[in-house]
């Protein structure tokens, strides 16, 4: 029984749709391609050109008579590939506007795409703060102190809860990119031109 339960937990952990499942069940959100399992939606090496080819195939197979409303991308490099596929399929015109395309990591190309009104947003995690937190944890471990954590319950690996130190991510879009990314010194105005 414990083994079956463990497999069920692992299977549940790899379902991409868990937070979205109520919306899918009510048909408020429809994944036209039917691809919702992690193994179906994973992009090898997070590669933009691979994501572009995959999106081109999805558009050709599942969206000939319907339009795409949103693409939830886990990484900005993938978002750029998705946008290239959408644009080559005619999206981005007044008769066929670009869908909402999200991303993560506030990469330069995606921030420029946000400024241009293409990508809708990106999730920004300041690597300077991440590096500082990691460095502090390493120092604590090297000096025999327990590393500082601020979350002991959320992250589970199938066996136990894994303590973590979480930093607050920031959603960046056209309305706040300058304040979040330029004022903080992450990018300069010249880099974003």
Task: Locate each region found by the language model.
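Second-shell loop/turn segments in exported
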Residues: 2-6, 37-45, 66-70, 120-124, ...
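Short, solvent-exposed amphipathic alpha-helices that sit
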Residues: 8-34, 50-54, 81-85
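Hydrophobic alpha-helical segments within soluble ligand-binding/sensing domains
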Residues: 11, 15, 49-55, 106-110, ...
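Hydrophobic alpha-helical
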Residues: 37-39, 43-113
């Amino acid at each position: 029984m414990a083994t079956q339960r463990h497999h069920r937990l692992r299977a549940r952990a790899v379902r991409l749709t868990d937070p979205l499942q109520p919306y899918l069940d009510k048909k408020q959100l429809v994944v036209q391609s039917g691809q919702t399992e992690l193994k179906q939606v994973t992009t090898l090496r997070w590669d933009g050109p691979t994501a572009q080819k995959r999106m081109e195939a999805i558009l050709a197979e599942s969206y000939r008579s319907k339009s795409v409303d949103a693409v939830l991308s886990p990484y900005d490099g993938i978002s750029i590939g998705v946008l290239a596929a959408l644009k080559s399929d005619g999206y981005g015109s007044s008769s066929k506007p670009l869908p909402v395309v999200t991303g993560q990591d506030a990469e330069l190309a995606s921030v420029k795409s946000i400024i241009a009104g293409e990508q809708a947003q990106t999730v920004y995690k300041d690597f300077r703060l991440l590096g500082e937190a990691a460095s502090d944890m390493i120092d604590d471990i090297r000096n025999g102190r327990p590393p500082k954590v601020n979350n002991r319950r959320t992250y589970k690996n199938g066996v136990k809860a894994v303590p973590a130190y979480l930093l607050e991510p920031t959603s960046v879009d056209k309305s706040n990119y300058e304040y979040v990314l330029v004022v903080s010194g992450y990018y300069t105005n010249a880099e974003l031109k």
